């Protein structure tokens, strides 16, 4: 699979369909084996995307290598690749769940302290919070749970004890798109740019099938009270149906926002 070509398709899709977006987040696993040339290629490809961007890391990345060879990155005061964006009444927290050498990543005390500080600030400012990280914190009742975020209760405690209004938690890592909750917080996962896995739930044995598509990125739309996460398939969409079967689907009206 040519993931570079796929990434280029994703960027073109985002620019064409969502060019007015306020932020584009690249949520980790930027490279497969933390290759310097992969980080350079990633930066060269995303330069053409005019949407403001944030990047964080996943278990296939190496923070030291990334910080050495990448460009236009952001870190917190402790050197973790995580950032915050305040956008139209929302605080978007992009968290670095990676820990080099540990597939499950994690949130040691310095990371959690930064998260707690940002949440406290968001609460004081009356901002709604959207959290984005690489490792899925919620159990999907699939084998991937054995390498989901380590000690997820540590992060959950910081989020809930903050008193901040958390609209959504979004993760990748598991190669499947899902929606549910994590400790009472809305939580979604995205299949991402590489392969997608089939739902392989408890009780099943044998091989879990992997598929080349569809590849998904997420589109988050929020007005502060209603927050939707759309799974946008940019590779592997099924063939479109005859449009004459759905006459209402032309020049449709949207619900008025009060």
Q: What are the residue ranges of the model-derived segments?
A:
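N-terminal active-site segment of His-dependent metallophosphoesterases
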Residues: 1-41
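Short active-site segment of divalent metal-dependent hydrolases/proteases
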Residues: 31-32, 62, 137, 176
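His/acidic metal-ligating clusters that form di-metal
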Residues: 9-23, 105-186, 218-219, 247-258
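Active-site glycine-centered loops adjacent to acidic/histidine catalytic or metal-binding residues
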Residues: 28-29, 58-59, 134, 172-173
């Amino acid at each position: 699979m040519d993931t570079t070509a796929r990434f280029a398709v994703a960027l073109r899709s985002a620019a064409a369909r969502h060019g007015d977006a306020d932020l584009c987040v690249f949520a980790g696993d930027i490279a497969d084996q933390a290759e310097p040339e992969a980080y350079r290629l990633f930066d060269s490809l995303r330069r053409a995307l005019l949407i403001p961007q944030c990047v964080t890391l996943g278990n296939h990345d190496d923070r030291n290598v990334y910080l050495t060879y990448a460009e236009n990155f952001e870190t917190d005061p402790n050197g973790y690749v995580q950032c915050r964006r305040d956008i139209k009444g929302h605080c978007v927290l992009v968290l670095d769940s990676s820990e080099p050498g540990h597939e499950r990543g994690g949130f040691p005390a310095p990371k959690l302290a930064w998260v707690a500080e940002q949440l406290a600030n968001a609460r004081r400012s009356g901002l709604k919070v959207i959290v984005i990280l690489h490792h899925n914190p919620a159990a999907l009742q699939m084998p991937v749970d054995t390498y989901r975020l380590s000690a997820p209760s540590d992060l959950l405690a910081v989020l809930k004890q903050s008193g901040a209004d958390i609209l959504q938690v979004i993760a990748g890592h598991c190669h499947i798109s899902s929606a549910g909750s994590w400790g009472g917080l809305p939580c979604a996962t995205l299949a991402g740019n590489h392969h997608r896995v089939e739902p392989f739930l408890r009780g099943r044995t044998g091989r879990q099938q992997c598929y080349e598509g569809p590849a998904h990125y997420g589109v988050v739309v929020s007005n502060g009270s209603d927050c939707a996460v759309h799974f946008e398939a940019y590779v592997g969409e099924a063939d479109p149906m005859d449009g004459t079967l759905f006459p209402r689907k032309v020049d449709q009206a949207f619900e008025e926002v009060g």
